From Swiss-Prot:
BP-aspect Gene Ontology terms: translation
HAMAP family the record matches: Ribosomal_bL9 (MF_00503)
Keywords: Ribonucleoprotein, Ribosomal protein, RNA-binding, rRNA-binding
Species this protein is from: Pelobacter propionicus (strain DSM 2379 / NBRC 103807 / OttBd1)
Highest taxon in the source lineage: Bacteria
Family classification: Belongs to the bacterial ribosomal protein bL9 family.
InterPro entries the UniProt entry points to: Ribosomal_bL9, Ribosomal_bL9/RNase_H1_N, Ribosomal_bL9_bac/chp, Ribosomal_bL9_C, Ribosomal_bL9_C_sf, Ribosomal_bL9_N, Ribosomal_bL9_N_sf
UniProt protein name: Large ribosomal subunit protein bL9
Amino acid sequence: MKVILKENIDTLGHIGDIVKVAPGYARNYLLPKGLAVEATEKNAKALEHVKRQMAYRKDKVTQAAKLLLAKLEGITVELVHQAGVEGKLFGSVTNMEIAAFLKEKGVDIDRKKIALAEPIKQVGEYSVPVKLHPEVTASLKVNVSAPAAAE
C-alpha cells in the first residue's frame, strides 16, 4: 500500500514522501495515528499545494532573517563593566545582557538566538554569532570595557 507521510518517520522517510508499506502497518498504525494518508490522486494534489505553501512561508522567514542580518551588521554592542587590574570582569557578560542592549537599539532578538558559548569574563572585543534562521547566521561585535577611572 502506498501512503504519503505527514510526519518524519526515521525508518520510512520525511514529510511529503510517498512510500510503499505493508497494508497492515498502514491500516493499523500509520493511518490511525495520523502519521500518513493514503496515496490517492486527491491527496497527492493536496500535498503539492501544502508543499508550495510551506516553501512560500520558508522563503518569507528567510527574507526577514536576511533583513535583520543587515541591521545587525552595523551595530557594535558596547558594554561597560567593573573589572579588576588584569581586565578580569567582576561578574560576566551573558546573552541576556547583549539582547537587552540590542532591544535598546531597536533590534528585538530572542536571547536564545545569541550563541554565546560561555559568558564573557574578560575585557576586550569579541565576535558573537547570532543564529537568526537555520540558513542565516550573523556575527555581532561585542566590545566589553572597564569604566574610566575617576581622578
